[in-house]
Amino acid sequence: MPADDYPVTELTKALIARPSVTPLDEGCQTLMAERLSAIGFNIEPMVFEDTTNMWARRGNEGPVFCFAGHTDVVPTGDVSRWHTPPFVPTIIDGYLYGRGAADMKGSLAAMIIATERFVAKHPDHHGSIAFLITSDEEGPFINGTTRVIDTLEARNEKITWALVGEPSSTLKLGDVVKNGRRGSLTGNLTVKGIQGHVAYPHLADNPIHKAAPFLAELSQMHWDNGNEFFPPTSFQIANINGGTGASNVIPGALDVMFNFRYSTEVSADILIERVEALLKAHELDYDISWIFNGLPFLTGDGPLLDATRIAIRQVTGYETDPQTTGGTSDGRFIAPTGAKVLELGPVNATIHKVNECVKVDDLEQLALCYEVILEQLLC
């Protein structure tokens, strides 16, 4: 069968054609639900404010294997820079172009096709298969996966293994899987001063001058050495804003936003304690608030990682490399429940860019990998 005609290709195209920019779903989950319902899944829509979520499950017993993903996509950017319209899926030279092709409608289609094939071969499979799908992964992540997990936890419905379809691969399909992620902690700091005329500094108090030594020391601090699974904790200043825009006014306040990506060697509480101790040491007048974006998690050797290694080896012929690098994903909301979480998806070279694309052959290989993982865990 030509790659253009693979069922996974056709389903990916159907999903791309729905312009589901966060928090819109545009019928993607309805399309998925129709396919899953036809093979015995119970479909449970969970709509929270502007976000569409779906919990679908086949089976009532454990263990529970869950495909997790998102139907929302990031904005297209300047449409004139795209080779083809971003929501008109187009195949050129073996690549399928369109917003969401790699992140992550290709993965969603591969999950559906793999599950259909698996259920057809193993209608009486062990345990349960579930889908946790949201339209709020690329946005504020308030009413998406985290709300679904809260609902499941409230009724003691547990996920044993979760496979997130984030585009984990770097150079070729399956060369990298994410078996963990660093924690993410954001600080919003306001350093207070006294506004005044630059010609009369003795009548003002410049918060930029006051904060500069603190920020210099903070940016040079050593947080930890990392470990065999995680690189050392990193600190980055993301935004600094101060002043009125005029050259003759000393500002009354300085706003700084910064972020930690931290390993399992430290906790958010330790990072907060060290930052606030340094603020006090510099005798700054300040307000600070903290946003917890996710705890670090790690899935070590065990059934899920073993099954994924076997699947990638069997389908591609090479070994995968488990890593914890990169940004956060919705896996950070699933892992605290005790579930083992992995991420496996297409090559990520074009995600969030203009001309986002995925290799058509990779979509079929990804579906095959997902199917083998199901067989390894539920047969």
Swiss-Prot record:
One example GO MF annotation: acetylornithine deacetylase activity
SUPFAM superfamilies the UniProt entry points to: Bacterial exopeptidase dimerisation domain (SSF55031), Zn-dependent exopeptidases (SSF53187)
Annotated signal peptide: none
Active site residues according to the UniProt entry: 72, 137
Pathway assignment: Amino-acid biosynthesis; L-lysine biosynthesis via DAP pathway; LL-2,6-diaminopimelate from (S)-tetrahydrodipicolinate (succinylase route): step 3/3
Reactions this protein catalyses: N-succinyl-(2S,6S)-2,6-diaminopimelate + H2O = (2S,6S)-2,6-diaminopimelate + succinate
Residues reported in the UniProt entry to bind Zn(2+) 2: 103, 138, 352
EC annotation from Swiss-Prot or TrEMBL: 3.5.1.18
Annotated binding of Zn(2+) 1, by residue: 70, 103, 166
Similarity-based family: Belongs to the peptidase M20A family. DapE subfamily.
Function: Catalyzes the hydrolysis of N-succinyl-L,L-diaminopimelic acid (SDAP), forming succinate and LL-2,6-diaminopimelate (DAP), an intermediate involved in the bacterial biosynthesis of lysine and meso-diaminopimelic acid, an essential component of bacterial cell walls.
Subunit structure: Homodimer.
Protein name: Succinyl-diaminopimelate desuccinylase
Organism: Shewanella baltica (strain OS195)
